[in-house]
UniProtKB/Swiss-Prot annotation:
Keywords in alphabetical order: ATP-binding, Chaperone, Nucleotide-binding, Phosphoprotein, Stress response
Coiled-coil ranges per UniProt: none
Protein name per UniProt: Chaperone protein DnaK
Modified residues (Phosphothreonine): 174
NCBIfam families the UniProt entry points to: PRK00290.1, prok_dnaK
Keyword Chaperone assigned: yes
Domain of life: Bacteria
Family: Belongs to the heat shock protein 70 family.
Length: 615
C-alpha cells in the first residue's frame, strides 16, 4: 500500500509528516523549513505558496493569509489576481504545494493523506477541508481532530501506560481542548470543546490595535487606513509576540511607515511582556471556559488528569503556560514540539490505516450535538456532543397536521434549545406521505456520522417504506461539479508548474554544461590540436546560440535540449582523448610506485553512506 502522509493544515503554518521505520518524521519544505506558512499569493498570474508568498506579503496586495478561519463559511470568497476564490480552492493550493514537496522527498506519487482539523470544527468546516484535499488531488483517508493527533504523537511510545491526558491546543486561529484516556494502545477521546475563532492571530491583533492607537494619538495618522502600513504593523506585532516569549521587552522599529504634514513618520517604540500580558489577558481568560466544560463533560476533575499536553505555536506565550499551570495545578508536558505534533500524529494515523502501526486504536468524538427542528422551532437532539464516532442513531417522529403530504427535515448542529440559534447543516424533504390524521404517520429519522465526522441523514416513512437520504452539504458547500472543475484547474496549474520547472532545469543544465566545457577547453590548451578541439568548440557555440533563442518563458526548448546532448557527446569524446594522452605517463608512474618495497597495506572498513539516514 502506498504511503499515506499526515498533514496539519494550519491557520498560520502547515506541516507534513510520514511514517518511516515505524516512526513519524517531518518532511521539510524546499526552503528547509519544518513548517510552511499557510500563505498564498499571486504574481504575474501565477500562484505562490509558503515562505516566498509570506516574504512579499507587505508589497503584494494579492496575498491571502489565515484562509482556514473561513473554511465552511457560506458564500465566502476572496478576490485576488482578478478572480474570486473559495476557501477550499486556496487551501487546495497549500495542500498541492505540500503534496509536491512530499513527493520529491519520497520519490513517488502521493495520492492519500490524513488531514487534521480543529476538534471544534463543525460538519461544514470538515466537509470543506475534505473538498480542499480532493481539489488538490488527494484522497483524504481520514479527517482527525488536532488535539487527538497531538495525543497520538505523544503517546506512541507509551502504549503500555494508562493515562488521562488533557490536550490544550492554541494555534494561529483556533483553540481546542480535548481530554483523552490512553490505555493498552487505545486512544479514547472522552470530551472536546473549543473556540474556532480564538488563536494567535487574535493576540497579534491586540498588539496591532495598541500600536495603531498609540501612533494615531501621537501623529494623527491611522495606520489601519493604509494597507501597506497595516501589513508592516502585522509583521511587527507577530515578531514582537514571538520575542516576548523569551525576552521581557521587544523593540519595534518601522521607519517611514507613514507621511505627515512635516514629512515622513516613523514608528519606534518598545513593548514589554507585562504590557503584552495586559493587552491579551481577556483572550487567555476566554480560553479557560472550554477547558472547564471539557472536564465537566468527561466527568473528571483536574486531579484525575495525569498529563497536560501543550500544542500549537501560541502555547509558547508564557502567560498561556502560566494560565494552564494555575488552572490545572500541573506543570505542562513539553516533550512534543507544539508546531509539529499534529502532523506527526496524523502520520501515525496514516500508519494505522496502512497497517504499519499495530495495536493502536483511535476513538474520537463528535464535538457538537446533532438533531432536527421539530414543532415550535425546537431543536431536538438525536446525537449528543462527545459521542464516540462512528455512530448512528434513529428516532421516530410524526406529522404536525392532518393529511400532511410531506415533511421538511431541517438538520442542525449545536447546543442551543431553539433551532434558530444553532448551525443549519442542510434541509431535505420526504414527500408523498399518504393522507392520515396528525400524529399517525411514522417518520424514522436516522443520523449517521462516519469516522471523519461527516454527517449523513435519512428519513423513512415506516408505513410505505419510502426513504430519502442525503449526505449533508451545508449552504456554501461545493457541488461535485464545482469540485471536479477545481480539480481540473489545480491539475492544469500543476502541469504548468512542472513544465516551468523543467524549463528552468533545462536552462540551468545548459549553463552548467557551457561553464564546464569552457573550463575543459581552457585546461586542454595546446595539449590537443585545433582539429581535435574544433567539434567541441562548434558544439559549444551552437549551444550558446540555442540558449539565447530559448530565453523567453514560453520558448520551445527542443533545440536547446538537442544542442545540450550534442555538446555532452563531443565534450565527452574530447575528455577521453585527453585522458588517453595522459594515460601512458600515469601508467609509468604507477609502475614505479608498484616497485616500491615500502608500500604499506591498509585496513579498510566498509561504510554505509545511508547509515545516518536510517537512524
Amino acid at each position: 500500500m502506498s504511503k499515506i502522509i499526515g498533514i496539519d493544515l494550519g491557520t498560520t503554518n502547515s506541516a507534513v509528516a510520514v511514517l518511516e521505520g515505524g516512526e513519524p518524521k517531518i518532511i521539510t519544505n524546499p526552503d528547509g523549513g519544518r513548517t510552511t506558512p499557510s500563505v498564498v499569493s499571486f504574481k504575474n498570474g501565477e500562484s505562490q505558496v509558503g515562505d516566498v508568498a509570506k516574504r512579499q506579503a507587505i508589497t503584494n496586495p494579492d496575498t491571502i493569509i489565515s484562509i482556514k478561519s473561513h473554511m465552511g463559511e457560506a458564500g465566502y470568497k476572496v478576490n485576488a489576481n482578478g478572480k474570486d476564490y473559495t476557501p477550499q480552492e486556496i487551501s487546495a493550493m497549500i495542500l498541492q504545494y505540500i503534496k509536491g514537496y512530499a513527493e520529491d522527498y519520497l520519490g513517488e506519487k502521493v495520492e492519500k493523506a490524513v488531514i487534521t482539523v480543529p476538534a471544534y470544527f463543525n460538519d461544514a468546516q470538515r466537509q470543506a477541508t475534505k473538498d480542499a484535499g480532493k481539489i488538490a488531488g488527494l484522497e483524504v483517508e481520514r479527517i482527525i481532530n488536532e488535539p487527538t493527533a497531538a495525543a497520538l504523537a505523544y503517546g506512541l511510545d507509551k502504549l503500555d501506560k494508562d493515562e488521562k491526558i488533557l490536550v490544550y491546543d492554541l494555534g494561529g486561529g483556533t483553540f481546542d481542548v480535548s481530554i483523552l484516556e490512553l490505555g493498552d494502545g487505545v486512544f479514547e477521546v472522552l470530551s472536546t470543546n473549543g473556540d474556532t475563532h480564538l488563536g494567535g492571530d487574535d493576540f497579534d491583533n491586540k498588539v496591532i490595535d495598541y500600536l495603531a492607537e498609540q501612533f494615531k494619538s501621537e501623529n494623527g495618522v491611522d495606520l489601519k487606513d493604509d494597507k501597506l502600513a497595516l501589513q508592516r504593523l502585522k509583521d511587527a506585532a507577530e515578531s514582537a509576540k514571538k520575542t516576548l516569549s523569551s525576552a521581557n521587552e521587544a523593540q519595534i522599529d518601522l521607519p517611514f511607515i507613514a507621511s505627515g504634514d512635516n514629512g515622513p513618520l516613523h514608528l519606534q517604540t518598545s513593548l514589554t511582556r507585562a504590557k503584552f500580558n495586559e493587552l491579551t489577558a481577556d483572550l487567555i481568560k476566554k480560553a479557560e471556559q472550554p477547558v472547564l466544560s471539557a472536564l465537566k463533560d468527561a466527568g473528571l476533575s483536574f486531579s484525575d488528569i495525569d498529563e497536560v499536553i501543550l500544542n500549537g505555536g501560541s502555547t509558547r506565550i508564557p502567560a498561556v503556560q502560566e494560565s494552564v499551570k494555575k488552572m490545572t495545578g500541573k506543570e505542562p508536558n513539553h516533550s512534543i514540539n507544539p508546531d509539529e505534533a499534529v502532523a506527526l500524529g496524523a502520520a501515525v494515523q496514516g500508519g494505522v490505516i496502512t497497517g504499519d502501526v499495530k495495536d493502536v486504536v483511535l476513538l474520537d468524538v463528535t464535538p457538537l450535538s446533532l438533531g432536527i427542528e421539530t414543532m415550535g422551532g425546537v431543536f431536538t437532539k438525536l446525537i449528543e456532543r462527545n459521542t464516540t464516532i462512528p455512530t448512528s442513531k434513529s428516532q421516530v417522529f410524526s406529522t404536525a397536521a392532518d393529511n400532511q403530504p410531506a415533511v421538511d427535515i431541517h438538520v442542525l448542529q449545536g447546543e442551543r434549545s431553539m433551532a434558530a440559534d444553532n448551525k443549519t447543516l442542510g434541509r431535505f424533504q420526504l414527500a408523498d406521505i399518504p393522507a392520515a390524521p396528525r400524529g399517525v404517520p411514522q417518520i424514522e429519522v436516522t443520523f449517521d456520522i462516519d469516522r471523519n465526522g461527516i454527517v449523513n441523514v435519512s428519513a423513512k416513512d415506516l408505513g410505505t417504506q419510502k426513504e430519502q437520504k442525503i449526505t449533508i452539504q451545508a449552504a456554501g458547500g461545493l457541488s461535485d461539479e464545482e469540485i471536479e472543475k477545481m480539480m481540473n484547474d489545480a491539475k492544469a496549474n500543476e502541469e504548468a508548474d512542472a513544465k516551468k520547472k523543467e524549463a528552468v532545469d533545462t536552462r540551468n543544465e545548459a549553463d552548467q554544461l557551457i561553464f564546464q566545457t569552457e573550463k575543459t577547453l581552457e585546461e586542454v590548451g595546446d595539449k590537443l590540436g585545433d582539429d581535435e578541439k574544433k567539434p567541441t568548440q562548434d558544439a559549444l557555440e551552437a549551444l550558446k546560440k540555442a540558449k539565447e533563442d530559448a530565453a523567453a518563458d514560453d520558448a520551445d526548448l527542443t533545440d536547446l535540449k538537442a544542442k545540450s546532448e550534442e555538446l555532452t557527446k563531443v565534450a565527452g569524446e574530447l575528455a577521453m582523448k585527453l585522458y588517453q594522452q595522459a594515460a601512458p605517463k600515469d601508467g609509468a608512474e604507477g609502475d614505479a610506485k608498484s616497485a616500491d618495497d615500502n608500500t604499506v597495506d591498509g585496513d579498510f572498513e566498509e561504510v554505509d553512506p545511508n547509515k545516518d539516514d536510517k537512524k
